[in-house]
Design a protein with these regions (language model features):
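C-terminal amphipathic alpha-helical "assembly" element
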Residues: 144-145
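Conserved mixed alpha/beta catalytic, RNA-binding, or beta-rich assembly cores of soluble enzyme
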Residues: 1-120, 127-133, 139-141, 150-157, ...
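Conserved N-terminal glycine/acidic-rich loop preference
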Residues: 162
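Short, glycine-/small-residue-rich phosphate/pyrophosphate-handling segment
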Residues: 169
Length: 169
């Protein structure tokens, strides 16, 4: 606890009585997180992520690469035990609504991600679930991806498991 306090107070050197890799790791993570730039969003790598070992007929969910959004969606789906493909589109680390308002998360960027990550080759049931807050993109996305069925999911990640059980099975 004293080491963490010293790190928070900008200590240059911390001397510890015992060396424990687990403790040192936590202190290093604390040190790194204290000095991150709050104006630079923390991002995840744009990619297609497999959650709960999805099969080709499982649904494809779409979100942005803002870390909090990604982890919210991924954790809810993983916790439900339902398999899904999660396409994370590059939105410069912005949340869904922020990226949509800034023109960084639109039908073109979603279609680009779907094509770039070869999603069509991984799935047999071509159904994409958009975040509920960007339902207005569904018509444009149908034009960008004519072979796909576009569905509008819930507005909040916490509602995804119930939506997936009722609307996608």
């Amino acid at each position: 606890m004293l080491a963490a306090h010293s790190i928070c107070k900008d200590a240059c050197v911390v001397v510890m009585e015992k060396f424990s890799p687990e403790l040192v790791y936590q202190i290093l993570v604390l040190r790194k997180n204290i000095f991150t730039d709050p104006q630079k969003p923390i991002q995840v790598l744009p990619a297609i992520y497999e959650i709960n070992d999805p099969k080709p007929d499982d649904p494809v969910l779409v979100t942005t690469n803002f870390s909090i959004t990604y982890f919210s969606v991924a954790n809810e789906v993983e916790g439900s035990g339902l398999p899904a493909w999660l396409v994370v589109a590059d939105a410069e680390g912005m949340s869904v609504l922020t990226a949509w308002a800034a023109g960084k998360f639109d039908s073109e960027s979603i279609a680009k991600a779907v094509k770039q990550f070869g999603v069509g080759d991984k799935v047999s049931k071509k159904v994409i679930v958009l975040p509920g807050h960007v339902a207005v993109l569904s018509g444009e996305l149908e034009e960008e991806l004519p072979d796909w069925e576009i569905r509008v999911g819930p507005r909040e990640a916490v509602d995804l498991p119930a939506y997936m059980k009722s609307a996608l099975t």
